[in-house]
Amino acid sequence: MNPLQGLYTFPRGMDMAPYKENFEVYNEKRNMNVQNWYTTITDFEQNPYWLVNRTENEDKRARVLALASASFKVTDWLTLQGRGNIDYVNDKYQQEIYASTSPGIAGENGRYIYYTYQTTLLYGDLMAKLNKSWDDFSLNAAIGTSITDTRTSALRLDSKTASLYYPNVFTIANINMSSSAYIEESDDARRQMQSFFAMAQLGYKESLYLDVTARNDWSSTLAFTERKSRGFFYPSVGLSWIIPKSFSMPSLISFGKVRASWSKVGNDIPLFVSNTVGHIAAGGIPQPNDTAPF
């Protein structure tokens, strides 16, 4: 709903002031104030001041972050490290659209949109880090494991053109839950990723470096696939040469580096793709799973 549309189509020979000061007028038949406009109300013909004052939005977010880490130096070249964090988010959004707004947008008694979303993300990892040099060689390496656990819960209600039982009463109980309304509910959906990873950089005379990484992830979203047990593996390898460390460079060139690398990337799939589920739509209408795998 763009208030500018009503301004663009407003006749240039008419005065906007009465519709600005009295964007709503009392309707005796409905016993309430309704939108005041010079012509029939449509999606493109609405009083812009009505839209500004009678389309109310509220968007709130509550968030809690906490983290902790600890490390222990075993030797001068070996360190053990553990980290963990939690991220909790609670989003709430609602929109109140008053009765007499365009019938293509809201029902006769108005429209109410309510959305709430909670997510809790837990992450933890353990790593052993190595940093050692000898003669012309150096080695930086790490090996570890991590876990990411995400839990979500969501509810979205939209009366759409199904309208409300009572005009301009914006509560969930007042939504007419007919088939033209919209309901989307997610009950405590959970997703977990367990990982094992390793990385190493071998250097020679501070000029030639070989980088190797490897990671394997096991995702709960792959529970109903052939990759349930083996997850997915993605490595990378790179070789770089810092030229000034090996040869003298011309005065016009301050630095030179050559690098070649190869990598493979991996990712899991969204929730419920490997095991789709049915649900109940607005009005109590069952929506069974009709997408393979059943």
Where are these regions (language model features)?
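Extracellular/periplasmic, surface-exposed regions of secreted and cell-surface proteins
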Residues: 1, 8, 36-97, 107-294
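Betabetaalpha-Me/HNH-type nuclease active-site subdomain
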Residues: 3-5, 11-15
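Core domains of carbohydrate- and sulfate-ester-processing enzymes
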Residues: 13-29
